[in-house]
Amino acid sequence: MFKFDREQMVVEIAGRKIGGQPGEYPTALAGTIFYARHKIVEDERKGIFDKAAAEDLINKQAEMEDITGNPALVQVFGGTPEALVNYIDFVAEVWDGPMLLDSTSGEARMAAAKRATEAGYAKQCIYNSINVSIDEQEYQVLVESDLEASIVLCFDPMDPTVEGKINVLTNGGKTADKGMLELAEKAGIKYPLIDTAVTPLGNGAGAAVRASFAVKALFGYPVGSGIHNIPSAWDWLREFRKQLREAGEREKAKDIHHVCDVGANLVQVMASGDFVLYGPIDNAYMTFPAVAMVDAIIAEAAKELGIEPIDTHPFKKLV
């Protein structure tokens, strides 16, 4: 284990602290709800869903937070403005912790930022995300909102190297005119969470992991990623699981994906990650104990470097 020379920022969003030196604060874990084809969703366009089932999933993740000490975040995904607004209104009613406003649609993200501001729960929200694709209209909505936290994506499609990721943060790299950190600051973002933008194996996955160390060493900001996308996009694993299913080994095929999924998250934790977007919130019961174990190992090793874990750290609660 190691200690960064640069002072490490610790941000507090809706009562959860994220950041610090490795071994100091537990890894924050964000589970996604209302994702594509989520079985609790009845109408993806209108945002109609099983409220009892959704609340149960959020409560189960909160229970794992209480058990392990790892801060829980709810990553709310919606494909349309109507759906995402419906979802975040509901989550704000049943959950007082941080939630991410997430969509592949800029219109939906803008609607969510406006709604969170109007309804008075913007301080609970994390925008996802400030990146090289953000246009002037979406950026202006973010500027005018009350949001103070955002994922800042260090991804340059023209340069997937570690240097490229650092450049896109500082000067826009080969794609944007301004650095993402400058955009975040001018938008009133006080709490930037740097996402190293993990891409598939063979296309920059390793650089994204290495960038985690570089970002913390250079800037001291909290860092993390949605690294579970690696096994999801792994062609070999997809084909291997298909072969198992065809051979009648359906449970084994499912188990192998779960192992790789959770294992990928642990790579981000070991790479000095402060937060992990771990995928479906349904997997909280598997992800939290595994990450808590790795957090405890890191904290124990960091003690020799003079780093003391906080009282709610898994090392203090579970060891």
From Swiss-Prot:
Keywords: Methanogenesis, Methyltransferase, One-carbon metabolism, Transferase, Translocase. GO terms for biological process: methanogenesis, from carbon dioxide; methylation; one-carbon metabolic process. Pfam families: MtrH. It is an enzyme of class 7 (translocase). GO terms for molecular function: tetrahydromethanopterin S-methyltransferase activity. The complex is composed of 8 subunits; MtrA, MtrB, MtrC, MtrD, MtrE, MtrF, MtrG and MtrH. It catalyses: 5-methyl-5,6,7,8-tetrahydromethanopterin + coenzyme M + 2 Na(+)(in) = 5,6,7,8-tetrahydromethanopterin + methyl-coenzyme M + 2 Na(+)(out). Part of a complex that catalyzes the formation of methyl-coenzyme M and tetrahydromethanopterin from coenzyme M and methyl-tetrahydromethanopterin. This is an energy-conserving, sodium-ion translocating step. MtrH catalyzes the transfer of the methyl group from methyl-tetrahydromethanopterin to the corrinoid prosthetic group of MtrA. Belongs to the MtrH family. Its EC number is 7.2.1.4. Pathway: One-carbon metabolism; methanogenesis from CO(2); methyl-coenzyme M from 5,10-methylene-5,6,7,8-tetrahydromethanopterin: step 2/2. This is Tetrahydromethanopterin S-methyltransferase subunit H.
